[in-house]
């Protein structure tokens, strides 16, 4: 069993499944589906000026492989946005500071953040040293972790164990998605 997480930054995706769920994932929305013991599911992009999003597949622990399937529609207005000097953080799953996202991950404790940093901004996040953490740079460029090299858009970076994640931008801003679990 797996969970699929479809996060749509911009666009429109029509979806449906064998449980009778259906609808549209729209700008800033997320669909969190647990396949578990089995579900038929389809997604079809709809005509829109720009389509930008991603899908993450989460492998369920052995003991949860055959849980009943379930579906959660997290519309963009249900995803809290934390605004700080130089940053805007969308909390899709898990916590950022005192702000909780609409899901924590039922089977795999998950943090999923949509982070936008202005030029010259810094971002720090305490992390679980046992978690796997990676980012995907959506737009712009920045420095992540202790890397000297600037990472630009359309790149993913996997990080080793640690107690804190750090990011900073130069003269350009950056938008990245952060996943930990």
Regions found by a protein language model. Give the residues of each.
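Jelly-roll (double-stranded beta-helix
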Residues: 1-181
């Amino acid at each position: 069993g797996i969970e699929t997480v479809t996060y749509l930054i911009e666009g429109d995706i029509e979806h449906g499944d064998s449980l009778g769920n259906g609808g549209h994932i729209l700008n800033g929305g997320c669909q969190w589906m647990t396949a578990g013991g089995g579900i038929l599911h389809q997604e079809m992009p709809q005509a829109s000026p720009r389509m930008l999003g991603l899908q993450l597949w989460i492998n369920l622990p052995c003991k949860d492989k055959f849980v009943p399937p379930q579906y959660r529609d997290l519309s963009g207005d249900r995803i809290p946005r934390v605004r700080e000097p130089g940053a805007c953080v969308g909390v899709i799953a898990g916590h950022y500071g005192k702000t909780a996202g609409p899901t924590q991950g039922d089977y795999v404790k998950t943090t999923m953040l949509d982070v936008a940093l202005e030029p010259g901004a810094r971002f720090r996040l305490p992390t679980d040293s046992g978690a796997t953490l990676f980012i995907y740079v959506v737009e712009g460029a920045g420095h992540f972790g202790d890397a000297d090299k600037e990472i630009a858009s359309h790149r993913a970076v996997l990080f080793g164990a640690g107690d804190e994640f750090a990011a900073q931008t130069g003269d350009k801003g950056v938008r990245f998605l952060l996943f930990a679990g």
